[in-house]
């Protein structure tokens, strides 16, 4: 059968929160089958557990934030994206502050950590959410219109369009399509960094956001150009980072999707609305397992091979 996965060994790192600017220690621990991904705020007098669930998202300003009462875990999307890309179902995530560290602004460090810990299969079938009919969410009008859609597809594919009307971004591709039957998450998506604009920093920091942002963990632009001396990692790094985010946001459904995601100018808020809309329309999806690797769509066999 196509089995669930966790990591073999505990792994730990430290970093800063891109929004809080606070130092945080991150510990990733193996978890039993059917646990899912669970975040733990171990810095509090009593540890608070926050399961990685779309319905647990309480804030989507510049990040996906899990919330339980007054307790938050912010900026979960890059780690969730890495877990989705590597096919990891079960994991305990311990944090000593309210934000997952930003690392280099991509998912690459998390991919490295998870692979270093060793990825192992477990004696339990992996469950997938197979989309049976299209689900779409929209907001805005005209040039401000944003939308995101899930539609049936035997595998996992994403297509994304962006429109920032900025010379540095417009000089790159504003559209990308990734089908994991033929594309590699690790090689083609994981290294895409988050990005921001110098002229927005002051306003964001006054809102308690972007306090840990720097050229070390983001692509930063002035009015005309990219300020990072090393330039871009991919020719289409901007739109690929939006795909990276979407993969992480959608993995808050708790299981990998058998579907195609198509979006225009979507972000964390719309992605979360889409995930919730899918869960609410129960005739639009079904849970499936695969008796063997050979039965599963190529998208899941292509990169989830264990050494």
UniProtKB/Swiss-Prot annotation:
KW Lipid metabolism (keyword) present: yes
One of the record's GO cellular component terms: membrane
Pathway it works in: Glycolipid biosynthesis; lipid IV(A) biosynthesis; lipid IV(A) from (3R)-3-hydroxytetradecanoyl-[acyl-carrier-protein] and UDP-N-acetyl-alpha-D-glucosamine: step 2/6
SUPFAM superfamilies associated with the record: Ribosomal protein S5 domain 2-like (SSF54211)
Swiss-Prot/TrEMBL keywords: Hydrolase, Lipid A biosynthesis, Lipid biosynthesis, Lipid metabolism, Metal-binding, Zinc
EC id: 3.5.1.108
Gene3D superfamilies linked: lpxc deacetylase, domain 1, lpxc deacetylase, domain 2
Sequence positions that bind Zn(2+): 78, 241, 245
Catalytic activity field: a UDP-3-O-[(3R)-3-hydroxyacyl]-N-acetyl-alpha-D-glucosamine + H2O = a UDP-3-O-[(3R)-3-hydroxyacyl]-alpha-D-glucosamine + acetate
Active site location: 268
Single GO MF descriptor: UDP-3-O-acyl-N-acetylglucosamine deacetylase activity
Keyword hit for Cell membrane: no
Cofactor (UniProt): Zn(2+)
Gene Ontology BP term (one): lipid A biosynthetic process
Family membership: Belongs to the LpxC family.
Protein function: Catalyzes the hydrolysis of UDP-3-O-myristoyl-N-acetylglucosamine to form UDP-3-O-myristoylglucosamine and acetate, the committed step in lipid A biosynthesis.
PANTHER family: UDP-3-O-ACYL-N-ACETYLGLUCOSAMINE DEACETYLASE 1, MITOCHONDRIAL-RELATED
HAMAP family tied to this protein: LpxC
Name used for this protein in its record: UDP-3-O-acyl-N-acetylglucosamine deacetylase
């Amino acid at each position: 059968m196509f089995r669930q996965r966790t990591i073999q060994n505990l792994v730990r790192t430290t970093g800063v929160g891109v929004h809080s600017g606070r130092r945080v220690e991150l510990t990733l621990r193996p978890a039993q089958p059917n646990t899912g991904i669970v975040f733990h705020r171990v810095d509090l007098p009593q540890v608070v557990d926050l399961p990685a669930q779309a319905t647990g998202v309480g804030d989507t300003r510049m990040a996906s934030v899990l919330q339980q009462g007054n307790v938050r875990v912010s900026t979960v999307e890059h780690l969730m994206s890495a877990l989705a890309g590597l096919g990891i179902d079960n994991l305990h995530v311990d944090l000593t502050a309210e934000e997952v560290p930003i690392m280099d602004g991509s998912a690459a460090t998390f991919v490295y950590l998870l692979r270093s810990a060793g990825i192992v299969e477990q004696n339990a079938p992996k469950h997938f959410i197979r989309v049976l009919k299209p689900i779409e969410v929209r907001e805005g009008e005209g040039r401000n219109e944003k939308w995101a859609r899930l539609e049936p597809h035997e595998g996992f594919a994403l297509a994304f369009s962006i429109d920032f009307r900025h010379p540095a971004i417009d000089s790159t591709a504003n559209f990308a399509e990734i089908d994991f039957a033929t594309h590699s998450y690790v090689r083609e998506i994981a290294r895409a960094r988050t990005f921001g604009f110098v002229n927005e920093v002051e306003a964001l920091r006054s809102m308690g956001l972007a306090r840990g942002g720097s050229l070390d963990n983001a692509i930063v632009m002035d009015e005309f150009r990219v300020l990072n001396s090393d330039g871009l990692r991919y020719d289409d790094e901007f739109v690929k980072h939006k795909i990276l985010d979407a993969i992480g946001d959608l993995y808050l459904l708790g299981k990998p999707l058998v579907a195609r995601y198509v979006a225009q100018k979507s972000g964390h808020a719309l992605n979360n609305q889409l995930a919730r809309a899918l869960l609410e329309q129960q005739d639009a999806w079904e849970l499936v397992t695969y008796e063997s690797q050979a039965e599963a769509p190529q998208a899941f066999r292509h990169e989830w091979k264990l050494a």
